[in-house]
């Protein structure tokens, strides 16, 4: 039941925000940043990373992605590449303190007596792997766009 309510609320918020011109305001703000296009993408991913500390993936995907997708397209980036990069960024933020949703899910199924600090220490290699994966995807778009290009032309 919770997921349906979140889905409904996030969709309603996104529609109201876009209906009131919030998407145009955000697009204008992002495009006016004093960065090159890759800097704007990094700023979007950084904001997404920070939001991932506090919001679930459904909210972020339904609210943030539709707002930044036109900016990404206008900058000339592949939408498949950006969406995968966005998803990896979200996953990384879910592993990272201060909140770390994935860590608390793991704590719920871990045997009694394992402290959260041990789980935080154990997740560090996975965070490093996620960040390396993001860097690879960011610098070599073909890693994630080659297969869809082969499948869909």
At which residue positions do the language-model features occur?
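Alpha-helical transmembrane segments of multi-pass membrane transport proteins
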Residues: 3-153
């Amino acid at each position: 039941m919770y997921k349906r309510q979140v889905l409904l609320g996030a969709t309603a918020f996104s529609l109201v925000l876009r209906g009131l011109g919030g998407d145009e305001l955000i697009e204008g703000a992002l495009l006016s940043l004093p960065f090159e296009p890759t800097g704007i993408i990094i700023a979007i991913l950084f904001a997404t990373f920070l939001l991932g500390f506090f919001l679930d993936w459904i909210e972020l995907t339904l609210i943030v992605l539709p707002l930044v997708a036109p900016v990404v397209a206008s900058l000339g980036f592949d939408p498949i590449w950006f969406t995968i990069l966005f998803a990896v960024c979200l996953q990384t933020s879910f592993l990272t303190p201060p909140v770390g949703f994935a860590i608390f899910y793991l704590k719920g199924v871990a045997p009694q007596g394992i402290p959260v600090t041990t789980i935080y220490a154990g997740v560090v290699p996975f965070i490093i792997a996620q960040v390396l994966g993001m860097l690879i995807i960011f610098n070599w778009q073909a890693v994630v766009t080659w297969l869809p290009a082969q499948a869909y032309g």
